[in-house]
Amino acid sequence: AEKDIQVIVVERGDFPGSKNVTGGRLYTMPIKTMAGDMLEGAPFERKIVRERWSLLGDGNSIGIDFTSEKFRKEDHSFSILRATFDRWLADRLMEKGVFVIPKYRVDDLLWEDGTVAGVKAGQEEIYAHVVVAADGVLSFMGEKAGLKPKMTPHNYAVGIKEIIELPEDKINDRFNVESGEGVAHLFLGDVTKGLFGGGFLYTNKESVSLGVVVGVKALMENKQNIEAHALMDMFKERYELRTLIAGGRLSEYAAHVIPEGGYGGISKLSGNGIILTGDAAGFALNMGVTVRGMEFAIASGIMAAETIIQAKEANDFSEKSLARYETKLKETFVLKDLATSKTMPEFLDNESFFNFY
């Protein structure tokens, strides 16, 4: 918008963020340089200063608790609530001249001579030189544009999340942190009853985000006929969890499909008049002890914007012109990190990680 390009965001929710779900952690270090002042004053919940990992057995567990003064000195990562964060970010964009249209669902793409020329939302037709598809892991826009590879249940997981409200002082005491400081805690093992996946907990200012993620293929094939919501209920009843959330009030319940294909699950990133970003492009990385995605989405959005600015200057929105987008991403942490960890999905496909070990 600052480059005198009209930008329209079509949002199907009541407001930006109302339909978005995340575990709750944004790694800001990788995007600090490219984001500039974009995140200045952002409504972060807590700076993550403690890392915890737990292996859960049937009635027992073992864990690792790691903290470092470096975490306190540097803005490495933060817990966030998407409904708050995305709404704030949208307000900043509108101040810069971006049009945000809420309560509209994009139903189809508009085409002209084999090129994506806009979107259809209800009875409205919105024409554009470039459509940036940021419609999530199942991206029907990417599919309609012929950019999404044929995916299988193996490439997806489903996440169940709850937000439990607790007073700030109780969170500080129970998690041994000071105000403004937070904990990221990941769980493996009995939390998914031996299925591919795990559990998570992130502390917010006055709430805790916790949930379970389990592979879609594992759910379909499990002989125990366990459902994701049942895993969530059992997770909350474990001693390791119930003592941390005791007395809390459930304020939000959500579910979300998550890309698990890694580098091999990345879509074709651009075509004539269209670019895919974030989950729609498959930009997510599960390394077992670390789960990343939001910083990939932000970085890909920035690279998409730079590509469109160059395309506008050349008045060329063809697939060849927009291919600069992938070239730019290869020079950033997004495709570099995904390529470095490209064997991780196969590595984590070993069932022993979630039961025997």
Stretches with model-predicted labels:
Residues I302-Q310:
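Short glycine/serine- and small hydrophobic-enriched flexible loop segments
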Residues S61-R82, G118, V213-L219:
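Helix-loop-beta segment of a Rossmann-like dinucleotide-binding subdomain
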Residues E2-K3, I8, R12, A83, ...:
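Predominantly flavin-linked oxidoreductase catalytic cores and closely associated redox partners
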Residues I5, R12-G59, K161, K336:
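N-terminal FAD cofactor-binding segment of flavoenzymes
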Residues I309-Y357:
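C-terminal helical "tail/cap" subdomain of flavin- and related membrane-associated enzymes
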Residues T192-F196, K205, Q224-M303, D316-T332, ...:
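FAD/FMN-dependent oxidoreductases across multiple families
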Residues E74-F78, R82, V116-A117, P149, ...:
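Alpha-helix N-cap/helix-initiation motif
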Residues R174-N176, A246-G248, D337-P345:
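Short coil/turn segments at secondary-structure boundaries
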